[in-house]
Regions:
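Active-site-proximal, Lys/Arg-enriched surface segment
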Residues: 9-81
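Hydrophobic/aromatic beta-strand patches that form the interior of the parallel beta-sheet core
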Residues: 36, 85-87, 146
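Electropositive, glycine- and tryptophan-enriched low-complexity nucleic-acid-binding patches
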Residues: 2-8, 13, 59-119
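An internal, acidic/charged active-site-proximal segment
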Residues: 91-160
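Short, conserved acidic/polar surface loops in the N-terminal third of protein domains
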Residues: 46-51, 85-88, 135-136, 158
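Generic structural signal of hydrophobic/aromatic residues within well-ordered alpha-helices
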Residues: 6, 20-24, 28, 105, ...
Length: 160
């Protein structure tokens, strides 16, 4: 399976996270030197009025609110340029499933380490994900973390 095959697969409609994992698992060079990356993105749907999952949300790429579909992604890298493989994702749809982006962060990270047996030594993420609950989970899973600098005076999300 080539990198292009993964890209083509992701472009297909109705791909599940489990199907994605089955496709990319043989491509991973998983080791204790690997890292996981958690990031979210917004698929711009500003001209779509009939799609159920479209909602207003912040887009870093746009620097403001846009109508779109939010996706939280978990990516694996072995540090070699070009070796970035999505291994899990979640659609951010709090009205449908009641889950926050932080819930998805914890679910995907736990699944990667406990079920998929990923050997990566650490996880990289934006400071938005640096909640107390998330950091405790990262430590419990035996991972190190790297995050963007926390802003002084800005309250980080703390979930119970």
């Amino acid at each position: 399976v080539s990198h292009d095959a993964v890209s083509d697969y992701l472009a297909q409609a109705r791909s599940t996270a489990h199907q994605l994992w089955q496709l990319v698992q043989p491509l991973l060079n998983d080791s204790p030197q690997a890292y996981l990356i958690v990031d979210d993105s917004v698929q711009d749907k500003r001209y779509s009025n009939q799609i159920e999952l479209v909602r207003k949300q912040y887009s870093g790429a746009e620097g403001g609110l846009v109508r779109g579909i939010g996706v939280v992604n978990l990516v694996h890298t072995d540090g070699v340029e070009g070796n970035y493989y999505p291994i899990d994702y979640r659609i951010y749809a709090p009205q449908q499933d009641g889950k926050s982006k932080n819930d998805h962060f914890r679910d995907m990270l736990t699944n990667a380490v406990s079920n998929k047996r990923i050997k990566a030594r650490g996880v990289l993420f934006d400071s938005w994900y640096a909640s107390v609950q998330n950091l405790k989970l990262v430590i419990r899973l035996g991972l190190v973390f790297v995050t963007t600098p926390l802003k002084i005076g800005i309250r980080q999300p703390v979930e119970q």
